[in-house]
Amino acid sequence: MASEAKESPANNPGLSTVRDEATKGYIMQQTMFRVKDPKASLDFYSRVLGMSLLKRLDFSEMKFSLYFLGYEDTSTAPTDPTERTVWTFGRPATIELTHNWGTESDPEFKGYHNGNSEPRGFGHIGVTVDDVHKACERFEQLGVEFVKKPHDGKMKNIAFIKDPDGYWIEIFDLKTIGTTAGNAA
């Protein structure tokens, strides 16, 4: 007799398998990072990771800006500002960079907590690439800081890099992730 899948309700107390009709149109839309310097962060997410800037919102009264980035073709995005905002908020899996004005030039500013030191909390985001080893060779040439390279540690073929604010980004590919995570499957 086959055992229950790890993803089954029997193996996951609290898991609801009945999707409420009210949640039918929900998507995971964004993860927000606070950033010290938008110039450094925009360079990293666009040039290093290949994301596009989907929308920028400036809140001058509150002195902060939001930058939404993702893996979208912006050539067909609306040009009307309101329509572009709605379009952006309809894209799945975007990164929202929040910049509180002045942090980039404030010598007293100590930076933000990335969640990977005590007290631990948020861990990382993940980016799928075509080939984890080739991507990491490129990242190395670009001077990206690594937490873990694909050949390090017990879990091979995955890497962790840091963005300019120290947030961790897991890098993996679909060719190897199944075997890398195979023992946990």
From Swiss-Prot:
Its cofactor is Zn(2+). Gene3D superfamilies: 2,3-Dihydroxybiphenyl 1,2-Dioxygenase, domain 1 (3.10.180.10). It is an enzyme of class 4 (lyase). Its EC number is 4.4.1.5. Signal peptide: none annotated. Residues 1-21 are annotated as: Disordered. Binds 1 zinc ion per subunit. PROSITE patterns: GLYOXALASE_I_1 (PS00934), GLYOXALASE_I_2 (PS00935), VOC (PS51819). InterPro entries: Glyas_Bleomycin-R_OHBP_Dase, Glyas_Fos-R_dOase_dom, Glyoxalase_1, Glyoxalase_1_CS, VOC. It catalyses: (R)-S-lactoylglutathione = methylglyoxal + glutathione. One of its GO terms (biological process) is response to salt stress. The active site is at E170. Zn(2+) binds at Q30, E96, H124, E170. Residues 27-174 form the VOC domain. Transmembrane segments: none annotated. One of its GO terms (molecular function) is metal ion binding. Keywords: Lyase, Metal-binding, Zinc. Belongs to the glyoxalase I family. Catalyzes the conversion of hemimercaptal, formed from methylglyoxal and glutathione, to S-lactoylglutathione. This is Lactoylglutathione lyase. The lineage of its organism: Eukaryota, Viridiplantae, Streptophyta, Embryophyta, Tracheophyta.
